[in-house]
Each structure stands twice: as C-alpha cells, then as structure tokens.
C-alpha cells in the first residue's frame, strides 16, 4: 500500500519543502515564491468577470484539496451595493461581464480584508470594449496595501500583453490559465503548512505514563531467540499494552474445549481468530468468527475454523485460536495505524481507514517519527477517513484525543524499539468513548548496531527525538538558578533578543561581524537543528518583573548559548559560545562549555575545537581554565585555535 515515493513526499513535507511534479508547476511555484508572499492558509477567494473560468478555478481548488474562500455575510452586505446588478457573491465573487476596473478593485480589497480568506485570485476574461490595462492597474494599486497573496490570471493572448507587463512590474504573479494560478497558490499553502512541520520540535518520549520498555524488549528478544521475525497476535498486543495502547483481552486456546471455557469466563459475545505465523490476512482463509454468544458455539467455531484453514492453506502452522472480547464497530470507526521501514528514511508511521478492504480503499497518510500532538493531528487530517471522525451517519464524533494518544504511543514504540520493521494495528476501533486495538501484526528484525557507543539508541530514525535527558537545573553564582537545555525552534525570538542586547564588542567577538541582530536565515539555522550532527544548549533564566498594574510577572530569557557542529571527519566538532553581558562572571560560560562537551562526548566525538579572536582575553582565559590547548591559527594570525580532547 505504501510506496517509496510516498515516503519521499513525507520526508520533503517534514523538511518544509514543496514538491512539484512538472516543469510548468516548477516555474509556477518559483514565480509565486519569488514574490515573497508571507505564507498563509489555504482558503482562496476567486474574483472573476467570467463565470466559466471562475468555475474551472473553483473545481481545481477542490481537486488539489484547497478551500474556496467565501466572503463573510458582513463583507457581502457591504460590497454587494457597489457591484454591477448581475454580480454574484455566494461562492465565487463573479462580478459579471459588466465589471470594470473599479469593481475589481473594490472586490479584491474587500476579499483581502475578510478573515475567511487567505489569498485572492483575480481572473480577467477580455470582453469587447473592456480595459484590461485599467483592471491590471487597479490590481497593482490594491496590491500595495495587501498583506495576503494576490495572484492574477489574464485570459487571452496579444490583447492582454500590456496588462501582463503592468502585473509583472507590480510583482503580481500572472498566469494564462485558471488551473495554473490555483496550483501556484496551492504551492504557497503547502509551503506554509510544511514550514509549520519544519518548526515542530521532535518530542521526547512521552511525559505521560511511563511505558514498560524493558518488558517490551524481553518479548522481542524471546521471539528473536526462537529465530522468528513475526510476532503472534498475543505477542503483538503485549507490545502495544506495554506502551499503554488499549487492546482487547486476548487468550490463546489450543483446543476446542479450551476455547469453550475461555469464552465462557470472558463473557459473551466473543470473537475467535486463527493464530498462525504463516497467515497475515486471517479473513482471507476464514480465520475470523465474530459475535459468538455461547460456549457451544465457541467450541464448534474452533473446530470448523481449524478444519477450514487447514483445507485452504495446508502448509500453514497453526498454534491454536485466540479468544477475545468483541469490540463493536457498529458506531465506531475502523482505523489502521501502521509502520513501514524505508531505505533510506527508516521507520514511517501510516494512518488511514482500516478493515478488511484497506488495499482497495488505499487510504494512507504518513509521517516520519517522532510525532508530537500537532504532527499527530495533521497526520489524521491528511487521511480520507478523517471526514468520518466527526458526527457521521447518526454516530457521535470520535474521541480525537484518544486517537492522537495512540499515534503518540506508536511513535514512542518506534523510537524506543529499533527492532520494529512492520506493524499493522488493524482494526483500531475508535468511538466517542476511546480507542481499542482489536488486531495487530508486528514484524521485527535484529537492530543494526550503528550507535557507535553513543548513549542513545535512535540511529534508526531519520529525525532524532528531542534530547530531554540533557535538561539540567544549575545554581547561579550569586544566587538563583538557571535551566540548561537543548534549543527549541520556538526559541528564535529569545535568541534574537539575546543578540540584540549584546554589546557591540560581544557581538563582534561571537560573530566576527558588526551585525546588530541575526538575519532570518541565520536565526532559522541556529534554532532548527537536527540534534544529531549539531547541538545547541541554551541557559534559560526566569526573570521576575513587576508590571504597571503591580502584578509580578515571570518571563523566560535566554542568557547564554553553547553549540557545536560536527566536522566532516565525523570524529571532531567545532564549538561556539556566547553569554549575555549582564550575566558574565556568574559561571554560565564554564557550565555551558562543560555541558556541550558532555553532549559531544556522549555522541562519540573525540575532539572539540574552536577559533577565538586573539584580542579576546576573557574567552582565552576561560578556555585555558577548562583545559583547552591554545595555539596560533596558521591561516590567520588574528585567531587562536583552541582544542580539547574528549
């Protein structure tokens, strides 16, 4: 069901990139993104003087999963009297054939100010006697005061060439067809969504109830010791339960009499399922019987099932039949949560519709682990089955929080158990009361030993979890305490404030530049790190201030940063350090350096080095006190090379 190209899409999306599939789309995307529009949502309002092109554009909006931006009732009431009599504002903003430049200006201006609209597409169809240049000039004027994307589609050829020149001069992306214009806005919307994914901090293992990781590892080790790679249903559910994923109670019966006794003790109704390492799809061979209401029926179902499976798949090894309580899907939805392992991206979590027809439904959204709540929610939203999770055909809306928790727990499993190769929780039945895994199949293999002696065991992941183990509280010289922790993507504003508040000399010592603040690209590079090839630790101090109303407010402030980037030799790293001027002499510099050295050592690096300006005596003194070797830098006499063996 899942192809490598799907995984590549998921990786690009998580990296904040926009993928295009043709040269035409490539140039359309470049034209839009080069206009430096600030990425927004995906609600596109269409303003047109031709109904046909407008409808084509609206159809393509639905086709590529955008939303048609509709004007609010307040905007409609204010705008309608100013438009031609035949204008329609119900879905499209169809100005009719009588529309002129002023009508376009009024409609676009109103749409751009409407909170239900994220971008505006103006489609112009040339009419006899119409002024295409006048309309283009109106767009150019409106664009000066717009903060939302404005795109244009000027239909026609020679007669609208001068108008297109006006649009180009105003930096308004212009397209020849409605579909191309809508697709270009789709690129902006995708860029916005993917940039949100890029800024998500890879979460640590769940801070909720601690999973029984050791118990799960014992199950895996016992299976591998038996030279098996596919877990039984009971073993699979044991793994899920170890990570607090709700499962139906399941007991293995090895003969018909045991099946009858177990079913009677569990209470009816029950379900019986064949237990065989050689059968992946039990229903295909008649290996599932549901809604059994008596002990006699359970005994007979066991006998019939074993005989039926032996006839249809005689080579299959049969361990027995599992007996489990029925989990009714009458008002619940059947979901499939899975895991596939890709080369080279590693484990990938999948989500979609479950049941016996998943291959035909072909509903699979996917995301690279680890997940946080935002990523789990977005994963659900990208699936087609998401439309059925609200109130649907008389059924109540499902417990979304419970569904998201299962995804977070699966992510936790994937991070903690590198032996996992494949997993299908199908079906996971979810309703308004929660979620429960009814069936599960897990395949494993020996974990590759690629950690290089590192303390973590996440080398199987394309994206490392947030390393919460490096968070530590430290006392500050002179009183108080501060938190040293790995940097977050949302630390950008605090990091910028740290740099802005540095003295010119301190900024020059750190950046060898007279900059007064970090450029946006550098700020992103400093905060969006992978926690693998590079690491940044920040010292966070909680300041207490008295507001104008007399209330005491607590605000966090970054007062120091240490970081390293792994060198190309993969055995050493280069560091950088900065401390707020008003926190010098309080022990922050030495603590941040010792902490970043501990991280580098933990990662298996052998040496840490850096360049220090020769006229920075304070930094050189700190380096010597920490045991660094200070020597001239042969390529530039203005610097000293400082090194320390880890």
Region locations from a protein language model:
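Short glycine-cluster motifs
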Residues: 13, 40-126, 134
